[in-house]
């Protein structure tokens, strides 16, 4: 008998991996290619950054100005000097094609102002009087709008006053007409009384005259 293993032994020992479908294999190769390309780009960027950050060859270093040198080295300033020595030196990433200030807001993530500035759309207005003063000095249309509102208010007040005066004048006229009617009625009554008194006086005179004539006639007889 031969010592060579049979086909069954070979199949059991070195079983091949099942072949992937063509679509999955193509996708896997694309993913590997993309990762390789990204790694190459990252290495290239690192090389450029390190190249530009390195000093030119043959540079003789002199006394370098350290950021902590702006604070005098006296007792009590150790914490501030240490903070400046380990402070970050890189600035913010700037947007491409925009000329902005070297600052970025933490709230709205926009460039050109800091957190808490009045230019921020998320700025919380505090003192209303100070805000009105600022708007009046910064916005040229503020005075015109305020004058227009004041003029409209004055016109409305004048209209209401005119309506009130008209209503009061109508009431006065009605009251005056009623009082005039009462006075006329009183005058008529007075005239009637005066006429009655005159008539009564005339009657009394006539009676006296008749009685005097009758007395004279009786005396003559």
UniProtKB/Swiss-Prot annotation:
Compositionally skewed regions (Basic residues) per UniProt: 184-212
Q: Where is this cross-link: Glycyl lysine isopeptide (Lys-Gly) (interchain with G-Cter in SUMO2)?
A: 129
User: Which UniProt keywords are present, listed alphabetically?
Assistant: Disease variant, Isopeptide bond, Metal-binding, Nucleus, Phosphoprotein, Retinitis pigmentosa, Ubl conjugation, Zinc, Zinc-finger
ZnF endpoints (CCHC-type): 104-122
- Give the location in the cell: Nucleus
* Expression sites by tissue: Appears to be expressed in a wide range of tissues.
- Positions of the UniProt region annotated as Disordered: 1-76, 147-221
Q: Which InterPro entries match?
A: PAP-1
Q: Kindly state a single biological-process term from the GO annotations of this entry.
A: RNA splicing
Residue positions where Phosphoserine is found in the record: 212, 214
List every stretch annotated PIM1-binding.
Answer: 1-155
Question: What is this protein for, i.e. what is its function?
Answer: Is thought to be a target protein for the PIM1 kinase. May play some roles in B-cell proliferation in association with PIM1.
Q: Do you know which PANTHER family this protein is assigned to?
A: RETINITIS PIGMENTOSA 9 PROTEIN
Describe the protein's quaternary organization and the partners it interacts with.
Binds to PIM1. Binds to ZNHIT4.
**Protein name, entry field:** Retinitis pigmentosa 9 protein
State the organism of origin: Homo sapiens
Question: Which gene produces this protein?
Answer: RP9
């Amino acid at each position: 008998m031969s010592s060579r293993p049979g086909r069954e032994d070979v199949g059991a020992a070195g079983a091949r991996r099942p072949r992937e479908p063509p679509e999955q294999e193509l996708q896997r190769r694309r993913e590997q290619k993309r990762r390789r390309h990204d790694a190459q780009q990252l290495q290239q960027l690192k090389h450029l950054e390190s190249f530009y950050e390195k000093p030119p060859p043959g540079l003789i270093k002199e006394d370098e100005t350290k950021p902590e040198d702006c604070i005098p080295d006296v007792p009590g300033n150790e914490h501030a000097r240490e903070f400046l020595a380990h402070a970050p030196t890189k600035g913010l990433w700037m947007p491409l094609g925009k000329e902005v200030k070297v600052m970025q807001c933490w709230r709205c993530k926009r460039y050109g102002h800091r957190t808490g500035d009045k230019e921020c759309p998320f700025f919380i207005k505090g003192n209303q009087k100070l805000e009105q003063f600022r708007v009046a000095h910064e916005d040229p249309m503020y005075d015109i709008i305020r004058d227009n509102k004041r003029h409209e208010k004055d016109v409305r007040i004048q209209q209401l006053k005119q309506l009130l005066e008209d209503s009061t004048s109508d009431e006065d006229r009605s009251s005056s007409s009623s009082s005039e009617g009462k006075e006329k009625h009183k005058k008529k009554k007075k005239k009637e009384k005066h006429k009655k008194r005159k008539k009564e006086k005339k009657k009394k005179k006539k009676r006296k005259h008749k009685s005097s004539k009758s007395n004279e006639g009786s005396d003559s007889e």
